[in-house]
Amino acid sequence: KPVEMLREAYECGCRDFGENKVQELKEKYDPNYEWHMIGHLQRNKVKDVVDLVSMIQSVDSLPLLKEIEKQCAKRDICMPILIEVNISREENKYGIPLSETADFVEQCLLFPHIKLQGLMCVGPLSEDRSVIADCFQQMQQCFLALKEKYGSEYFRYLSMGMSDDYELALQYGSNMIRLGSIIMGERDY
């Protein structure tokens, strides 16, 4: 969306902005805003992102984790991240399987320039609210179990819910919602 819309949202009190695409992030970047990378991130784009964002919400593989560590170590910075979980098990979505989340947490904790902050997911594309609710409930249970095991230092955020399902996500413990189209309007591709 146009930069003017971001400015207007900022003037209305929005401070954190998410972007799905690295190129669009680079075009819209303003250092006054807190930027989160929320879309799929390829390893070769990490070097372009780490200087621009305050959090990467879409970490879903060990090679990506290693590249973030490498780029952050070069800059002597620590990057807050969320682990993206493919809660709906949809093949067209990114994220690690729910069953692998605990093992992936252990990997994240090995890197000194990575600051694990929680989990992120994208709900299933479904008209059936009970299907979405079931996925969100599973995410909530996973988040709470990991928070109990590792502490709130590593599990501060459950980023779950977008413009179409954020109300349901809030019922299941989300404390970070991603409201792109409801605030900015639908994307023009």
Q: Could you tell me what each predicted segment is?
A:
Residues 1-150, 154-166, 170-172, 184:
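Conserved alpha/beta-domain cores
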Residues 174-189:
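Gly/Pro- and small hydrophobic-enriched strand-loop and loop-to-helix capping segments
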